[in-house]
Amino acid sequence: MKVTSVADPILPLCQRLLPVRIAGLSLALLKATVLELAILAGHVLLYPSGIIQERRGPACPLPAPGTTPLPAEAKPPVVLLHGFIDNRSVFVLLRRSLAQHGRHRVESLNYSPLTCDIRTAAELLGRHIEQICERTGSDRVDVVGHSLGGLIARYYVQRLGGDRRVRTLVTLGTPHAGTRVAPLANAHPIVRQMRPRSELIQELAQPAPGCRTYFVSFWSDLDHVMDPLESACIEHPDLKAENIRVSGIGHLALPLHPAVANSIRLVLDTVRPGDEAGAHTGGLTVA
């Protein structure tokens, strides 16, 4: 998957200020870095708007005695789960894109930035999804998780029986195999859980026979948070999984870029009867 013309308006200025050739720095990396910085600046402004948990809609009313209930909306609700030290504001553009294309039941879950355990956060997600199903009358949901949010959702699906509720899990830049980036951050317990060969990562590698959820992982070839880059891929013999490589953007752009949002919508709208377990690969070029 390739995103085209991501930061073209800014590039001429960069090319004037920087040497013509910068050793070891490709044009694609330069464009992705400029975009990441622009997104970071914008997200700092939006961050306060997402601190408070969003208001929930009313519960689905029970049908009157002797009446036939109306059929539930064909498309299941979508749950958005942010990454480490972030909040629901990161999904403002994705949420708008989903709503514009018929996904009106979209909810975000804020978990505390002080969360120190992925398992605890996964239990919170499970309770949240049960509440959504009760309110909407839907049996299943789709989940989109960015970075740590994807790992929390995967733990819920794989280890807490969440495959009963989650139809499709889309992860964006999630360290499924752990990441070695920022070694000085090991003081935080949840960062240690995201390291390769951590107890939690090894737990996710255990057998998961009969898992009913379909997994789609978007991973970027310019993701500065994934070390190695392929750690954002799902490799598990028991899981029905697809890995989609995104070329040309970095970690922060994954939940915000229109081309990625379009691909997420296609993934969620695809019916997959009889999918077999095992990882599949694909690609999306965005720059």
Residue ranges and their predicted role:
Residues 1-78, 92-93, 101, 270, ...:
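Flexible, membrane-associating and regulatory peripheral segments of lipid-active enzymes
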Residues 54-57, 69-72, 201-217, 268, ...:
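Conserved serine/cysteine hydrolase catalytic core
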Residues 78-89, 95-212, 217-219, 225, ...:
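Serine-dependent carboxylesterase/thioesterase catalytic core
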Residues 94, 227-234:
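Short alpha-helix in the alpha/beta-hydrolase fold that links the catalytic acid
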Residues 104-107, 237-254, 264:
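Catalytic histidine neighborhood in serine/cysteine hydrolases
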Residues 117-118, 249-258, 284:
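Catalytic histidine-centered segment of alpha/beta-hydrolase-like enzymes
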Residues 221-224, 248-250:
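Acidic beta-to-alpha connecting loop that harbors the catalytic carboxylate
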Residues 255-269:
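Post-His helix in hydrolase/transferase enzymes
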